[in-house]
């Protein structure tokens, strides 16, 4: 599994911002749609997520749209 994974809801504005941010910075990542596959939300919650989007970068979680936290975790 890619060490960078976004658990997202397809209609979520913050989810779209995170995906756009990753794409704009050339970050390779996997996307897990929790709306289409609700079992993925349970998987993310078991790993510590409380809110979505939940971005897992290695073993760290960034929840919601937090550009500064994403930059710090990605070394940008």
Describe the role of every protein-language-model region:
Residues 27-40:
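Thiol-based oxidoreductase modules, predominantly thioredoxin-like and allied folds used
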Residues 58-76:
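Non-catalytic, surface beta->alpha helical segment in thiol-disulfide oxidoreductase systems
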Residues 13-14, 38-39, 69:
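Short alpha-helical
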Residues 47-55:
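Structural micro-motif
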Residues 9, 49, 67:
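ATP/adenylate-binding site constellation spanning eukaryotic-like Ser/Thr protein kinases
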Residues 1-25:
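Local sequence-structure signature of Cys/Sec-based thiol-disulfide redox active-site neighborhoods
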